[in-house]
């Protein structure tokens, strides 16, 4: 039961992390040539980042791998133990899927549905900035604090150097061996 709680806290922190970010990763202003600015990368991979979730009662640290295809799809793999993926979050600009591999369950939701339960809201651009180390806080570390219910949750991510334009594995996880649950049961 205690492990369930860790998964929920880490999942909530990861999904809420971009809530306060307002800076865009890519400028929407035309460049000197009059064309919109194009991102400097197509794929991005950050391996073995350290994500730490701190609550009033607990502290949980896990390795996180973030794989992104620009404006298309991203995968966040949470591995508290070396090489064992325990939680996976797959996202597209329209949908989020959280997969709990330990308990054999998953939940799907849209950003609109998720934002009915979260305050402030979360969007694709903010999540993509988190997964590519393009946050206004810099490429080395991100730190956020939230109120979730009556509990304060703090998330600290320490990034390793990112690799761009490398092959990434962002194929959808086959969900037929998992049981679908409502996202509200996790949040």
Region roles according to the model:
Residues 121-140:
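Charged, gly/pro-rich active-site loop segments
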Residues 33, 52-63, 68-73, 79, ...:
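A general "mature secreted/periplasmic domain" signal
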Residues 20-22, 138-187:
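Non-transmembrane domains of secretory- and envelope-associated proteins
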Residues 19-65, 179, 184-187:
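N-terminal leader/targeting segments and the immediate start of mature chains
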Residues 44-48, 59-64, 77, 89-93, ...:
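Extended beta-sheet lipid-handling architectures
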Residues 1-7:
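Bacterial N-terminal signal peptides that target proteins for export
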Residues 14-18:
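C-terminal motif of bacterial Sec signal peptides marking the signal peptidase cleavage site
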Residues 73-125:
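An acidic-aromatic
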């Amino acid at each position: 039961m205690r492990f369930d709680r860790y998964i929920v806290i880490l999942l909530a922190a990861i999904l809420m992390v971009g809530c306060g970010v307002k800076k865009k990763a890519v400028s929407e202003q035309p460049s000197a040539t009059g064309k919109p600015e194009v991102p400097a990368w197509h794929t991005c991979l950050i391996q073995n980042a350290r994500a730490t979730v701190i609550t009033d009662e607990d502290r949980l640290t896990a390795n996180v791998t973030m794989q992104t295809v620009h404006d298309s799809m991203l995968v966040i793999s949470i591995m508290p133990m070396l090489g064992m993926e325990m939680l996976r979050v797959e996202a597209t600009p329209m949908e989020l899927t959280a997969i709990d591999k330990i308990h054999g369950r998953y939940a799907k939701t849209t950003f609109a549905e998720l934002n009915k339960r979260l305050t402030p809201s979360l969007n694709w651009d903010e999540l993509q900035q988190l997964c590519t180390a393009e946050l206004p806080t810099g490429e080395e570390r991100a730190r956020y604090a939230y109120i979730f219910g009556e509990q304060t949750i703090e998330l600290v991510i320490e990034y390793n150097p990112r690799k761009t334009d490398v092959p990434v594995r962002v194929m959808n996880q086959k969900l037929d061996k998992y049981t679908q649950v409502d996202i509200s049961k996790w949040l």
